[in-house]
Each structure stands twice: as structure tokens, then as C-alpha cells.
């Protein structure tokens, strides 16, 4: 059965979905077992249903043939499996696919990036973003709300269903998930962590913890909490070799400076097995802003005590941005300086930029309700880790 993609016209015409049924996509395995316990069922029934949901992308209880008819009927009365719908699809000349996914009356964006040996899905965690990184299109849209567990894992579910339906086209199944889409994942831990647990669960998508990566700009208290909650690979959105530059392009640095951030990163490395002893440093290359050889020397000195590999990211432009992309020659010189210090340094290949699906280009459709409030809190009061 081919996967239906809802048109924007369909989405705008459809009434808002209001249901008192439990959306099983909101439940990790522990919560799923608790739910089945309330139905008077044994825990293995939860495992059976999860296997149908995630191994087969099944959202119809009647298709779950190893579940007895009485239980299927009971589930239809009190529960549902409802993933967010794709309302627009764009395909890049390089094979990258970007989906606009409806979450309520707004959209987030999810990107599928196939390569020879893997297929990576870039997943959003919030509707918009409050951190206001100056080089990122998402940040310019403002912030509306956190995504629910079902809206996060639902992006993976929906993509897996589409790619599965497209097997005849030779598309690779999803092998890696990166929490690098719209939003700051650490500002939505309550929903991001259960979603990642489902990604890792053998009855969920069964991914290795080394193949699920969370990227953060540096919400230090939440990073410390993350290390006590789950073990996944970590990517650090650093982007500057000193506080002066980072204060300007990554404003959260005014609250949690580089020294404080990297200390938290080292604490996480000490707790984590997924990172194999080192994290990934993400560094966007902005022409004559942070890409000089002097900046490379500063960065190498800064990171000497942090086990890491470094990804240099050619900046991807968006309308109204005040920056330019570093030239290949400047990126090459920068990379060679870092390698001379012994750092593994990779220049990230730009994918999907012809459909605005590249790093920093995701925008979605955001009603900005809380951006100014979050800005004030970043400048003064501590940022709380909030749920939906």
C-alpha cells in the first residue's frame, strides 16, 4: 500500500482532530506496559503492539493478527496510533527528501538523507526555536511550542512508512536519526528522551545508541540531566573559538559560556558509552567571521582537553541573513590547521540545499508566541526544562 501524502488544501480543510483516546505513539515501552496493565493485560501484549507499530509501521489494530479479537476491539475503543501527516514533499537532485509535517495548525520539517552506506533522518523537536542563533533559519521563525513524544517519534514513523512504501525505488531504510532539525532538543527533554528511547528499543526502531545523535547549543543544566536519563551520541553546536564571537552568533552563550558548556560536555562523555569517548563538534563556517587561521588555532587550543572530532559545516544561506559562506580555500586552510594539532576534521558535504533542506535552512511554519519571553529569560533568569 502506498503512503498517502496530504495536500496543503486537504490539511486546511480538515477539522482539528480532537480525541480522548490514548495515542500509543506517545508511550515508550515502560508507559505502554503500564497502559496495558490498566486494561488488565500482561506486559507482553504491549511488546506485541509496539512491534507491529514500529517494525511494520502498522496503525490499524485489525491488522495485528497475533492480538486476539477481544483485545483488538478494546484497543479500538480507548487507543489510537496517530502519526502527524506529511503535507508537502520536496525531493533534491542529490536524493535528499524534505517533508513538511503538520503538527496542529503549524508545520515542522523532517529531512531524509540517503547515502551509499546509510540513510539518516533529521528530526525536529520543537515548533520553531527560541535560541536565536544568527546563522540559522529556524531561529528567525521564533518559537511556538515543544513537540509531543508522538510528534517526534511520529516523524520517524511517517518517514519509515513512506520509505518502506517506496522500496521499489531502491530507497535505503533509516539507519541513523539525528536530533538536528527545528528546535533545541534539551529544552524539550520530557518528550525528546521517551522518543529517543523508542528509537533505541528493540520493540521500537531498534537503532544502536551510536546511531541516534542529539545536537545541542549548550543548555547546560539540561545536558547534565540528559546524561542521567539516556545514553546517545552527542553533537555540540559550538561554531566559535571564543566567547566574544559566540556571544554574537549563539546568544545562549551569554548565559552558559564556552568554558561552562565544555565542562558539561566532558561530564557527559564520562557517563556515555555511545560516544566512544568523544563527541562531535559542529562548526559552521561564516566568511570572515569565524573562519580565519587565527580562529582555527584558538579552536584547537580551546578543545585540547575535550575528546572530539570536528565537523566543519559550510554555511547554507537563507533570505535576509547577514553572513556569507566561507570560500573553499578558507575552509581548507582552517581544516589543515586543526589537523596539524591532531584533530580528526571533516568538512560536511552539503545535502538538499536546492530544497532548503540543508543544515540551518529548516523553517517550517511557526506562529511565534513565546520568543520575546524566552529571550528575556535567556538574558536573566535560568532556562527551565519544560514539557508540552
Curated annotation (Swiss-Prot):
Cofactor note: Binds 1 [4Fe-4S] cluster. The cluster is coordinated with 3 cysteines and an exchangeable S-adenosyl-L-methionine.
Keyword NAD included in the entry's annotation: no
Any one GO MF annotation of this record: tRNA binding
Main location: cytoplasm
Keyword rRNA processing on entry: yes
Pfam families, per database record: Radical_SAM, RlmN_N
Cofactors demanded by this protein: [4Fe-4S] cluster
EC number: 2.1.1.192
Entry's Gene Ontology BP terms: rRNA base methylation; tRNA methylation
Cell location: Cytoplasm
Family: Belongs to the radical SAM superfamily. RlmN family.
Listed name of the protein: Dual-specificity RNA methyltransferase RlmN
Annotated source species: Cronobacter sakazakii (strain ATCC BAA-894) (Enterobacter sakazakii)
Amino acid at each position: 500500500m502506498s503512503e498517502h501524502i496530504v495536500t496543503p488544501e486537504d490539511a486546511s480543510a480538515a477539522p482539528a482532530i480532537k480525541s480522548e483516546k490514548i495515542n500509543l505513539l506517545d508511550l515508550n515501552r515502560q508507559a505502554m506496559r503500564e497502559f496495558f496493565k490498566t486494561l488488565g493485560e500482561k506486559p507482553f501484549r504491549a511488546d506485541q503492539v509496539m512491534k507491529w507499530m514500529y517494525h511494520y509501521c502498522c496503525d490499524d489494530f485489525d491488522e495485528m493478527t497475533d492480538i486476539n479479537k477481544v483485545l483488538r476491539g478494546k484497543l479500538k475503543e480507548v487507543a489510537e496510533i496517530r502519526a502527524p501527516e506529511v503535507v508537502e514533499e520536496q525531493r533534491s537532485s542529490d536524493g535528499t527528501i524534505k517533508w513538511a509535517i503538520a503538527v496542529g495548525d503549524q508545520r515542522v520539517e523532517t529531512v531524509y538523507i540517503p547515502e551509499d552506506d546509510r540513510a539518516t533522518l533529521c528530526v525536529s523537536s520543537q515548533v520553531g526555536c527560541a535560541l536565536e542563533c544568527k546563522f540559522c533559519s529556524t531561529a528567525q521563525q521564533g518559537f511556538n511550542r515543544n513537540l509531543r513524544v508522538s510528534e517526534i517519534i511520529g516523524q520517524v514513523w511517517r518517514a519509515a512508512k513512506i520509505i518502506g512504501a517506496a522500496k521499489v525505488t531502491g530507497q535505503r531504510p533509516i539507519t541513523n536519526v539525528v536530533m538536528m532539525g527545528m528546535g533545541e532538543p534539551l529544552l524539550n527533554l520530557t518528550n525528546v528522551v521517551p522518543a529517543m528511547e523508542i528509537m533505541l528499543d528493540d520493540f521500537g526502531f531498534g537503532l544502536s545508541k551510536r546511531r541516534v545523535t542529539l545536537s545541542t547549543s549548550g543548555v547546560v543544566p539540561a545536558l547534565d540531566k540528559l546524561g542521567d536519563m539516556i545514553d546517545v551520541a552527542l553533537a555540540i553546536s559550538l561554531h566559535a573559538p571564543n566567547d566574544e564571537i559566540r556571544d554574537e552568533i549563539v546568544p545562549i552563550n551569554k548565559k552558559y559560556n564556552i568554558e561552562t558548556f565544555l565542562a558539561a560536555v566532558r561530564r557527559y562523555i564520562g557517563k556515555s558509552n555511545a560516544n566512544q569517548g568523544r563527541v562531535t563538534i559542529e562548526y559552521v563556517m561564516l566568511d570572515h567571521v569565524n573562519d580565519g587561521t587565527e580562529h582555527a588555532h584558538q579552536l584547537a587550543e580551546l578543545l585540547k582537553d575535550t575528546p572530539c572530532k570536528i565537523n566543519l559545516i559550510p554555511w547554507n544561506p537563507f533570505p535576509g541573513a547577514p553572513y556569507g559562506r566561507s570560500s573553499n580555500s578558507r575552509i581548507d586552510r582552517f581544516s589543515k590547521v586543526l589537523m596539524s594539532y591532531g584533530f580528526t576534521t571533516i568538512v560536511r558535504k552539503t545535502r538538499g540545499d536546492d530544497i532548503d533542506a540543508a543544515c540551518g535552512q529548516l523553517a517550517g511554519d511557526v506562529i511565534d508566541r513565546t520568543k520575546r519571553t524566552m529571550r528575556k529569560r535567556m538574558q536573566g533568569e535560568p532556562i527551565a526544562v519544560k514539557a508540552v
